[in-house]
Amino acid sequence: MKNFALAILVVTFVVAVFGNTNLDPPTRPTRLRREAEPEAEPGNNRPVYIPQPRPPHPRLRREAEPEAEPGNNRPVYIPQPRPPHPRLRREAEPEAEPGNNRPVYIPQPRPPHPRLRREAEPEAEPGNNRPVYIPQPRPPHPRI
């Protein structure tokens, strides 16, 4: 199997390298850049067909409809406005009847998390004052 695959590779390489037996340069040079068409002579000016501009597509740009004449006014159907979607705007729920009032469970508010909001430390009593270390202010940075 290895020999068969190797033979295929060798044949492919030989065909790729030695397959082009025509070593002569091409007779017609390849045009790399497109050259301009030669200018038409002034005496050879014949009329050129220029088509009319196409009208705009009716769905892309519509002109305003012409005003109706006063005597030709007929009623136009105007649909009712749609109600708002129930999930977008809810009206207040109707009040319950007094005889049907039953207690509703309202949970107590949760205390704030201790790391999020701490109350101030309680003031020390005047008789229990001990000295507190207050560091010296740092000198300004030399580059500032």
From Swiss-Prot:
Residues 134-144 have a biased composition (Pro residues). This is Apidaecins type 22. It comes from the Eukaryota. Apidaecins have bactericidal activity; predominantly against Gram-negative bacteria. They seem to interfere with cell propagation. Keywords: Antibiotic, Antimicrobial, Cleavage on pair of basic residues, Immunity, Innate immunity, Repeat, Secreted, Signal. Residues 20-144 are annotated as: Disordered. InterPro entries: Apidaecin. It is found in: Secreted. Residues 1-19 form the signal peptide. Belongs to the apidaecin family. One of its GO terms (biological process) is defense response to bacterium. Pfam families: Apidaecin. Its main location: secreted. Residues 20-42, 63-70, 91-98, 119-126 form a propeptide. GO terms for cellular component: extracellular region.
